[in-house]
Structure formats: C-alpha cells, structure tokens
C-alpha cells in the first residue's frame, strides 16, 4: 500500500515543479513584453519636429501688468509644445484682428505649421523673443507691449547697443545689417495689448 502512495507523491511533486516552472516562464514573458512596450514609448512632451521642444521656459516678468503676463505665459506654454491650434485660439480670442503675415495668411495654425515643416524655427523664435526685454509702445491709440524692445523704437539708430547684441541670439550679422540699412527693426516681433489681447506675431514691413 505504501509504494503506490510514494509513486503518487513523486508524480505530484513533478507536476507541481512543472507548473511552477511554467508559471515563472509566463511571468518573465509578461515582464519582457511590458519592458519592451515601455522602452518604445516616447515622451509625449518632446517632439522631434518642434523647434522649441527642448527650450527652457523664460522666467515671468514681474514688471509686466498681470493680464499681459498671463497672455505671455499662455503663448509660451503653447509655443514650447508647438501647439499651433492652441496658439491660434489665443491669437483669435481678442477683440481685434490678429496679424500673422503681411501676405494674406488667414490661418495662423496652418501658417506656423508650414513654416516649421519647411525648417523655419518660428516657435523657437517666438520663445526667444518673449524671453527678451520688452517695450511699452502706443500705436493707433492702443497701448502695446512689444517684444523685442527694438521694435518699439522709432528707428534702428535709437536701439541701444545692448539690445542689438541680444538680437544676435535670433539673427546673424547679415540680418542685423539689413535692419540698419532699412532704418528700423523689421524682424519677428510680438505684440500684446494692455488688455491682454495678442495682436501680432509677424515679420517684415
């Protein structure tokens, strides 16, 4: 009577070991699959096709009116993510028209998306400009806060040398020379009204 019991016990032990080994294999497979899935998932916050993706957020400027500071922060958040549609919402939220181009463009999101696709880093430029000194300006009876400050001067000769040097982060010597030849700054600039409406992000004359 004892021998059959021993045989059964041995058989049961083998079955238990097989089951245990099989279970371990399944766990390893699941773990490997999970690890593979995790390693292949890119960080959604970083986009290779976004010129501003790896830029740092410019610090808040306490000298700006609160509502202008809020608009600046909203623009920066969207620009750093190349959120063209989000930027377009900010641009069209104001009471007046938004100027994105002097060439008849009427879809800011599509315009910025196309420029980025062509290799023109407009989002990087937008972030860089909003990190530079600004200047309070009055145009058409409206108080505006403009970046860079160079745009707020009457002529290029009035722009202090220090502010000209800061523009080298965005422009090369040839472009800076073109501003001097033209007589004023006509590069990319940003304008926000005292009410916090985003008026323009445009270049040219």
Where are these regions (language model features)?
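Bacterial N-terminal signal peptides that target proteins for export
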Residues: 1-12
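N-terminal, intrinsically disordered, polar/charged segments of Gram-positive cell-envelope systems
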Residues: 10, 32-45
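C-terminal motif of bacterial Sec signal peptides marking the signal peptidase cleavage site
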Residues: 19-23
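Short helix-adjacent coil turns
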Residues: 74-87
């Amino acid at each position: 009577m004892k021998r059959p019991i021993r045989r059964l016990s041995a058989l049961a032990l083998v079955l238990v070991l097989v089951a245990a080994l099989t279970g371990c294999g399944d766990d390893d497979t699941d773990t490997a699959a999970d690890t593979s899935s995790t390693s292949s998932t890119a960080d959604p916050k970083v986009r290779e096709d976004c010129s501003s993706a790896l830029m740092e957020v410019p610090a808040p400027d306490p000298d700006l009116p609160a509502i202008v500071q809020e608009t600046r922060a909203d623009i920066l958040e969207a620009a750093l993510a190349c959120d063209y549609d989000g930027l377009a919402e900010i641009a069209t939220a104001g009471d007046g028209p938004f100027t994105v181009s002097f060439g008849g463009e009427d879809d800011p999101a599509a315009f910025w998306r196309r420029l980025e696709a062509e290799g023109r880093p407009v989002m990087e430029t937008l972030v860089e400009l909003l990190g530079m000194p600004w200047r309070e300006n009055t145009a058409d009876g409206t108080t505006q806060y403009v970046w860079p400050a160079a745009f707020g001067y009457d002529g290029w000769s009035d722009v202090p040398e220090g502010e000209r040097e800061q523009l080298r982060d965005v422009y090369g010597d040839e472009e800076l020379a073109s501003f001097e030849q033209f007589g004023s700054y006509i590069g990319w600039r940003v304008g926000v009204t005292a009410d916090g409406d985003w008026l323009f992000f445009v270049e040219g004359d």
